[in-house]
Amino acid sequence: MVLQKRPDYGFNGYEVPHTPRAARSPRKSAFKKKSENHQISSFDLLAAVAGKLLLEGGNSSSSSNNTSGNNEDQCAVKKEPLNGGDIMVEEETTNSDHDNNNAERSFFVSEILQKSHEMQSFNRSPSPLKEFHFGSSSGITSDSSEKFETQELAYDESKINNGDCYRSESNDKKSMLGGLNFEAKLSRNVVGKDEKHIGSGFRKPIPQNPSTCSDDVDLHGKENDDGENFSACYRTKSFRSTLRIGDRRIRKVWASKYCKVPPKLKDTTVTNSDLDLKSDYYSKKHCLKSLRSERNYPIKKRRYFDGYTASQSEETNKNEGQSGSPRKASAFLSSIACQKQPAAFQSPRDSNNVKLGIKSFRVPELFIEIPETATVGSLKRTVLEAVTSILGGGLRIGVLVHGKKVRDDSKMLLQTGLSLDTLSDTLGFCLEPNPPQSTKPLSPEDSDFARPCNVPHTLTRCLPSPGKHAKPSNSVESDLDSKPSAPNRGKTIYSRALIPVSPLHAQALTVVPPRKTKRSEVAQRRIRRPFSVAEVEALVQAVERLGTGRWRDVKLRAFDNAKHRTYVDLKDKWKTLVHTARISPQQRRGEPVPQELLDRVLTAHAYWSQQQGKHQLLEGPQQLETSLGL
């Protein structure tokens, strides 16, 4: 028996209610699975049973006539062997006075199959099974839970035309609300006869082999005019009930560690009304949505492996999140280049070591005093001796952390806040002269003027202290209370010579004195340096010879060796002397100047003032003639 599918499921008079669709993810799997291991479905089983029963037409027709006019509730069970197995068909009928109420029919078939492949071949073979008949008696369960008696199965003529089901309605009875659904379920346990009460729904048996009951059979029928016979139509249900789907769909969606798998639906009460189906389905649908929305999936934590292993990452976590990525920082003058090697390439012993590379240091400023009578060669030798004394062991290292000097050399790096993640701008170094060997002003007696010029002078190499960062620092502080630090053990020293100089002769060495900043020059100018009596006498003598209008010549003649005296200073001093000579002695301030020098100042000032006036009178007509071209 082959059924043809139509968009309306092959029925003209009755339309199947709208099927609620499940979530997207359960729809990915097929609703039906083909029976495996040669197991037939319930529809094929019913077709085979109907074919066997149609062969005995006499018995079925007689039983149909007997049950048509009988008003009593009857139930009969016919049992026939089929291919070595027993098949028992039971139908329960209940007559109720309420014709307008909905009725539910249950049709139970239990079977024990031994040769299922023979049943499949029997179903697919061409046979006169296209027309088969059922009687008007059916298994109907009412809501009133009335007792019922047995009634024999009867078969009557019915036709199936391309899957269409049709029959006439009686004039004295109203059409039933909803279709009469006969759901055939296969079970290996035979339904007993002694069941007398069935509620509004039937208790659905859970088959032991789900593949044998994958299809449902619906029997839609309406009474004829005589109220005796009706036509039946078998078809495969286009959808499964919610609870049948629950074993596959709902359990599939609930299969997570946050959702508990529901128990097997053995004692679940099922109603066949469309309203109950929709409400039951949508209630579970919303429940599933709420469960899915409340899932708290664990956040996947990304691990960034930046050149270190898991064991080393634990060590870095203990050291307050020390990173293993390489960092480079370089600066000039008083800066360093800090290169942190990746921890993956270091041994566990050296994983917490801080390796630094100091590129340069700033030499402290040198202050040297030398008399005016010293020669250039003596000046060179003096500067060379000062530099040699500093670089030869007169320096010490000062450590600055965040601009503050660390005076205790016995502290650990972690105690001072220095670790692998320390930035290069938090640490600084400075070169300081040792207190006992600090540079002192050199006098002519201290300088060795008698040293021959061919004596070689070499500069020693000073190795900076490794193991720390450096920061530019302009301040030079004395570290008097610092303690000697213990030498580093097992650490490689990365250092360069500060000034690697080969042995040279003093004559070939040109030492440029450190250039003083503009600020220092301004500070030296602001220092008040009064003229002495000798300097005043030298100034008066030079002005008497050269005049008051030649201050540059006066500077070169009288104050050539005095670098701190400029020609502007000489001019200002001359004006001050003229003003001092003109006022009374009681009004004068500063160092007293002899009256004889003041008289000479007035005489020289009056003379050069007259000479300057005469020179202007003589040069005036000559410049006018030259400008006019005469």
Swiss-Prot record:
User: Where's the Ubiquitin-like domain?
Assistant: 354-433
Q: Per the record, where are the segments of Polar residues compositional bias?
A: 309-325
Q: Provide the disulphide bond pattern.
A: none
Residue ranges of the HTH myb-type domain?
A: 523-582
Expression tissues = Expressed ubiquitously.
Tell me the compartments it is located in. Answer: Nucleus
This protein's UniProt keywords: DNA-binding, Nucleus, Transcription, Transcription regulation
A single GO cellular-component term on record: nucleus
Observed phenotype of the null mutant: No visible phenotype, probably due to redundancy.
For molecular function, the Gene Ontology terms on record are: telomeric DNA binding
Q: Which SUPFAM superfamilies match?
A: Homeodomain-like
This protein's major location comes to nucleus
Where would one find coiled-coil regions in this protein? none
Q: Where is this region: Disordered?
A: 1-38, 56-78, 308-327, 463-489
Q: Does the keyword DNA-binding apply?
A: yes
The Low complexity compositionally biased stretches are 57-71
The organism's superkingdom is given as Eukaryota
- Pfam (any one): Ubiquitin_TPR1
Q: Which sequence positions fall in the DNA-binding region?
A: 551-578
Q: Quaternary arrangement and interactors, per the entry?
A: Homodimer.
**Biological function:** Binds specifically to the plant telomeric double-stranded DNA sequences. At least 6 repeats of telomeric sequences are required for binding.
Q: What is this protein called?
A: Telomere repeat-binding protein 5
Q: What is the lineage of its organism?
A: Eukaryota, Viridiplantae, Streptophyta, Embryophyta, Tracheophyta
